């Protein structure tokens, strides 16, 4: 019975991994590759890519985008991957590969990173560097908590009604208390931009949809890229698969079933 259960779990895990959309796959592979590359001692990859407030300048602005991909050690990377992968997969499935790329290597990363640097330097007068994808995790959690709040405003513990939108805030405090060395400020900056995006203001941050559609059609991305998710959320690229659970949308088209609402974050 036990070997059969193990085989079943292995098959489910393999099936899940083979269905991951393109951007999520690339993020997972990049984190794994950079974690392996960080093991060598010839070049300090962590020092190069960390978000260090006093190191941010025009020539080092790449740090605003590289820090989520680099981790302190293998365990740090594994824990963040376990938390990030399902959240990123749901986001990309709903909003498309190009939109995910534009947002996560754009405003959803750079805005909280700049906020962290400014608060560290101007308010705390400190220079604590941060690494890891946990800021992305809390950004995505905050976005989902807002969507959940719209349909289920409270959850109950004992006789206390707790707003569902506070879930990522509670989790960030628990993580800060239980795991030494974590950046509460970094997580709070990620949560803040997640709340903004969750309320629908990401359309002010994302590139215009007509531009993304033009790129998608011009480069014929649906045909040439495996597991690419179209902006219209109904079509995957070659070798990709459709979402396992669909329901009719308002116009009769299929829409991916996600936790909470299916409201777009794009324009």
From Swiss-Prot:
Its main location: Golgi. Pfam families: Rhomboid. Residues 247-267 are annotated as: Disordered. It is a multi-pass membrane protein. Disulfide bonds: none annotated. It catalyses: Cleaves type-1 transmembrane domains using a catalytic dyad composed of serine and histidine that are contributed by different transmembrane domains. The chain crosses the membrane at residues 20-40, 67-87, 99-119, 126-146, 155-179, 185-206. Its EC number is 3.4.21.105. It is an enzyme of class 3 (hydrolase). Keywords: Golgi apparatus, Hydrolase, Membrane, Protease, Serine protease, Transmembrane, Transmembrane helix. GO terms for cellular component: Golgi membrane. One of its GO terms (biological process) is proteolysis. The active site is at 134 (nucleophile), 187. InterPro entries: Peptidase_S54_rhomboid_dom, Rhomboid-like_sf. It is found in: Golgi apparatus membrane; Golgi apparatus, cis-Golgi network membrane. GO terms for molecular function: serine-type endopeptidase activity. Probable rhomboid-type serine protease that catalyzes intramembrane proteolysis. Belongs to the peptidase S54 family. PANTHER family: RHOMBOID PROTEIN 2, RHOMBOID-RELATED PROTEIN. This is Rhomboid-type serine protease 2. The lineage of its organism: Eukaryota, Fungi, Dikarya, Ascomycota, Pezizomycotina.
